[in-house]
Amino acid sequence: MIGLTGWAQSTPVKGVVLDKDSKEPLAYCVVVWKGTRAGTLADENGFFTIGRIPTQDTLKVSFIGFEDAFVVVKNNVDLTILLKGLDMERLNIYDQHGTQHMHGKDPQLFQTVTEKELCKAACCNLSESFETNASVDGSYTDGITGTRQIKMLGLDGKYAQLMGDNIPNMRGLNTVYGLGWVPGPWIREIAISKGAGSVLPGYESIAGQINVAHKGPEMKEKFFLNAYAGNQGRYELNTVSRHEAGEHFHWDWMTHYAKNNGRFDMNHDGFLDNPVGDEYNGRLHAALNNDNGFNGDYSIQGLQYLNQAGTSGHLDIPNVVMNNNQWKWNVDAKNGWVFEPDAADEKEQSIGTQVSFSQQLSKWNWEGVKNYSGRQQTLRLVFLHAIQLNEDSKLTYGWNYLDDQYKEYFSPMGSWDRHERVQGGMAEWAWNHHDEIQIIAGARAEWHNLFGFLLTPRLHTRFTLAEGLHLKWMTGLGRRTANVIMDQPGFLASSRVMSIQALTNQPQYPLGLPMEEAWNKGVVLSYDTKLFYRKAGITVDAFQTNFKQQVVMDWDQSGLLKVYPLQGKSVSTTAQAEAFFSPLKRFEIRMAYRWVENMVDYEDGRRSLPFVSKNRFFTNLSYSTKMFEGDKRWLFDLTAKWNDGQRLPNLLGSQWEGQQPEVSPAFWIINGQVSLAREERWDVYLGVENLFNFKQNRMVLYSDGSDGTMNLDANFAYAPAFGRMSYVGLRWRLAE
């Protein structure tokens, strides 16, 4: 530790320290007289003043990530000192707060979850990757199929725009299932944006945007392997390999295999807690670039998902077998050209294109009761042009074409086919005034062959009130087409009959139902500071989503799922406070509280949405030891979540009246993990989820039907069925 002492002399030395490449100031760098303990710190703008000493005329200037500079002071001229950055690929720096962080200076409420954060839990796939995140909730769609879904801002995940590498590809028939088809070990980072978000990816964002960035050429290792085994009978093997063919061409190959063979009924309701089956998934990705500003990104992915759910055989009840088989493949191509200005009056520009095609096949069978099959084919074409208008502003505009073809068959209701074609333009203007005021304004204007002209405006603003203190305000419109079966796949795991009340004056609408449309507005106050000389911060946000049109799913009807257009108001209001700080070196605490009120005008009155916790507390503790034996360390992570009671569907008048409470009990979920890591080589991890073994005992309601089949309803899942789950895993990396 260097003791820094100010020396007052009659002719102090003054100067500024800059990054040699970017010419940006280097804040708080160390300036000392060479060979002494006499020195000072530069201020936030890189300026420094240091008193002279009679025994030395050479200054040593140091900053993390840069080479030291030695400057001989010969006169009283103010100094400009340029530091050269080190080769960061050769540095091994442990970033104490780099695993999950808010972007305070972004006009959106934008959060990044890195690969290191995902390693704090098992995170077998994207649907399980939010266990250590306070903004996104994970839950189950029903008590039989084991399908996981997410919620944002008190709304189902179908109202969030889900993307892979900035391409919306978890939508339509795979809005729910698609989350489980992104293996966690393939993920480099996840970007989460609350609110309507940017207009450039599309109009389907209402509650937020989630973008998954896959691993690629930037990987440090040549080969990565992840193996996982859990006591629930689940086993996984994942690989990622990186290859080079010359300086400008890189490609990587990803594989995933998962097997579930545990036939457990830990809550003793007569049904398997998780389905049994297999998943095969593979992805080939290639990246091409040259010295003229061109970058190409291409990928092809295919998967097969086969599972079976139903009765466990532990109780004397009629046998139920539900088969769920899914196939999906997609091809994506992105090209970009960056044009550097050749003259002083030229503007920096870039052009980008996206071409994406995907096909999904879905087959669901509950023999004698329900059969569903669906096929979705999607083609997306995008052209974007970005130009730097001046030092403060940038304009991005472009053209978009979307072609969606759906063929669905649901027994006993028949065939549902639709063909959606959307084309139009979009533009987004970004203005940044001295990094103190920032505005992003955008809009889309498109023509939809079924719903007509669509105008989608959005606005995000940020004001810096003081150093580290930012106020944000945002608003925007979002819309989507409802998929009444695959938006609520838990409906298939019940004897409920679907009743659709169509709009008689709009025969061109799919099933006679309108496009869902909502305004989202939010305000955010964030503060980044230092506590105990370490990074700390707090973010407080409030959002309200007001639906102008909505397809209401009414579960409060005996034996029915009623589907009808909103006739009144539907408003979701949320408020959240999240703070993090580090009381000790390598020890971080993250805490959050969230409040939700979600009210809907159903056809028989206003009430809250089911399966929404009004209050939720969240705490995550992370600690890592010092390195020992050169490059090893222990990592400890603990996450605690308290969920308030949730309103359950109404059973009045049904054969199961009184068998479920009106509101579920509140409960804690405690997860923990211990890892032994050898830096950049391997990790061995051991974890437990639901430490206190809380489980929902009555998740499925059933009775014998008059025709020998079973009447059942599994749409009451508010908590885990399996209880405590432990797992062990290995992450192994092969360096260059």
Question: Where in the sequence are the language-model features?
Answer:
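Gram-negative outer-membrane beta-barrel transporters
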Residues: N432-D435, I538-F547, P565-P649
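C-terminal beta-signal and adjacent terminal beta-strands/loops
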Residues: W642-L651, V674-E736
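N-terminal periplasmic accessory domains that precede
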Residues: N76-L82, L126-S129, R148-K151, M163, ...
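Short acidic/polar hinge/loop motifs at secondary-structure boundaries
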Residues: F48-G51, I167-K194, G282
